[in-house]
């Protein structure tokens, strides 16, 4: 495999992992809430909805239902860069879903 195809394959796996973490943390946050989240997952975007709130991820951006946007990136080391801050993928997914479901 060429370096480009390895990077593309790694990014696909990171994208799937990000969606899975969002789903898991949304379910966990839903245990202590009167609402639940719905995750829409595709190759180009992931949307998490909880009640009237939503957050949408593309490969380069996070957009919220309130109109806010922020840069977003999945890094090869398994971290996430969101709004200029780098964090472990699981911590970022927990924070995103917790904020969405409050």
Predicted features, each with a name:
Residues 1, 86-89, 101:
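Detector for methionine-enriched segments
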Residues 1-37:
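Contiguous, amphipathic alpha-helical segments that mediate oligomerization or scaffolding
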Residues 9-12, 19, 48-51, 66, ...:
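Generic detection of intrinsically disordered/low-complexity segments and helix-coil linkers/edges
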Residues 24, 29-66:
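Amphipathic, interaction-prone secondary-structure segments
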Residues 52-91:
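Intrinsically disordered, low-complexity regulatory segments enriched in Ser/Thr/Pro
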Residues 92-102:
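Extended, compositionally biased alpha-helical segments that mediate assembly or anchoring
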């Amino acid at each position: 495999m060429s370096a480009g195809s390895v990077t593309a394959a790694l990014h696909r796996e990171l994208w799937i992992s990000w969606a899975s973490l969002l789903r898991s943390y949304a379910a966990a946050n839903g245990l202590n809430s009167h609402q639940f989240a719905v995750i829409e997952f595709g190759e180009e975007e992931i949307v998490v909805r909880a009640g009237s709130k939503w957050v949408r991820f593309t490969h380069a951006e996070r957009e919220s239902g309130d109109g806010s946007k922020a840069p977003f990136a999945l890094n090869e080391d398994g971290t996430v860069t969101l709004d200029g801050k780098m964090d472990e993928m699981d911590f970022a997914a927990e924070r995103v879903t917790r904020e969405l479901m409050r």
